[in-house]
């Protein structure tokens, strides 16, 4: 039986020169100077509702609307944010606002 072969026996080792031609380790990507666009009012409200969906201290959010969850949390004395209730009242028929983050995923 012969000696075990290593992968480097089949492929030559190529050492690359480190120098100023490329970037060295530890360099950060160049700053593009672009500022993120400010969110629209609807996007800010939807982000608030997403955060409400992800806050488990108000109970589970699958199978019920956000407004039902808000009312249930209030009845249980969990003190849900009043801003969430205001947003939900201002968009009564819009499923983007009324349905939870997980609504479109099958159970």
From Swiss-Prot:
Compositional bias ranges of the Basic and acidic residues kind: 15-28
CC per GO annotation: delta DNA polymerase complex
Compartments in which it is found: Nucleus
Motif PCNA-interaction protein motif (PIP box) positions after renumbering to this chain: 1-16
PTM notes: Ubiquitinated; undergoes 'Lys-48'-linked ubiquitination in response to UV irradiation, leading to proteasomal degradation. This modification is partly mediated by RNF8 and by the DCX(DTL) E3 ubiquitin ligase complex (also called CRL4(CDT2)). Efficient degradation requires the presence of PCNA and is required for the inhibition of fork progression after DNA damage.
InterPro entries: DNA_pol_delta_4
Region (Disordered): 1-35
Keywords: DNA damage, DNA excision, DNA repair, DNA replication, Nucleus, Ubl conjugation
Annotated Pfam families: DNA_pol_delta_4
Coiled coil (residue ranges): none
One biological process term in Gene Ontology: DNA-templated DNA replication
Domain of life: Eukaryota
Quaternary structure and partners: Component of the tetrameric DNA polymerase delta complex (Pol-delta4), which consists of POLD1/p125, POLD2/p50, POLD3/p66/p68 and POLD4/p12, with POLD1 bearing DNA polymerase and 3' to 5' proofreading exonuclease activities. Within this complex, directly interacts with POLD1 and POLD2. Directly interacts with PCNA, as do POLD1 and POLD3; this interaction stimulates Pol-delta4 polymerase activity.
Family, similarity comment: Belongs to the DNA polymerase delta subunit 4 family.
Function: As a component of the tetrameric DNA polymerase delta 4 complex (Pol-delta4), plays a role in high fidelity genome replication and repair. Within this complex, increases the rate of DNA synthesis and decreases fidelity by regulating POLD1 polymerase and proofreading 3' to 5' exonuclease activity. Pol-delta4 participates in Okazaki fragment processing, through both the short flap pathway, as well as a nick translation system.
Protein name, per record: DNA polymerase delta subunit 4
Originating organism: Bos taurus (Bovine)
